[in-house]
């Protein structure tokens, strides 16, 4: 979904991924970020840090939370069957928080609940980001090797 203003646009994407891996939340986050980036959102990556530095950074990040504006914001819903241990859900949440911190994404909240209708863990990530407003394409402003025009079935998507 896109909401346009005079200078920029607000884009939103929702992705659901199913599976039993602890990395499933990170996969859903990656798909959401890729979809947002494909629509023009820009993401910044924080440099890799060690675990000792990570603990110090957690303390400092509380003080410097307003120093960097987040690239995007996400909300996460996790539905899991009754037989899944809560420790697996906590692992998914921990990996998601770590990935969000690395890519400067604000994690608005994680909601996890037991759902007897699902057979595998279902992680739904809804992301929202700002992007520069797209200019209208026309023949007069088009330059060779600058614009990609999709035709046929690819252009219908």
Question: Which residues does each predicted region cover?
Answer:
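Glycine-rich anion-binding loops of enzyme active sites
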Residues: 42-59, 70-157
């Amino acid at each position: 979904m896109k909401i346009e203003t005079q200078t920029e646009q607000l884009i939103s994407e929702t992705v659901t991924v199913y599976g039993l891996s602890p990395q499933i939340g990170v996969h859903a986050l990656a798909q959401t970020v890729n979809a947002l980036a494909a629509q023009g959102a820009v993401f910044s990556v924080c440099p890799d840090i060690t675990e000792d530095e990570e603990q110090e950074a957690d303390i400092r990040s509380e003080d410097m939370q307003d120093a960097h504006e987040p690239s995007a914001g996400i909300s996460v819903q996790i539905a899991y069957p009754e037989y899944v241990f809560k420790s697996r859900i906590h692992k998914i949440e921990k990996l998601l928080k770590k990935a969000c911190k690395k890519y400067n994404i604000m994690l608005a909240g994680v909601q996890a609940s037991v759902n007897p209708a699902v057979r595998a863990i279902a992680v739904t990530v809804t992301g929202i980001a700002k992007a520069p407003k797209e200019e209208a394409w026309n023949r007069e402003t088009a330059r060779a090797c600058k614009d990609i025009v999709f035709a046929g079935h690819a252009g219908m998507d």
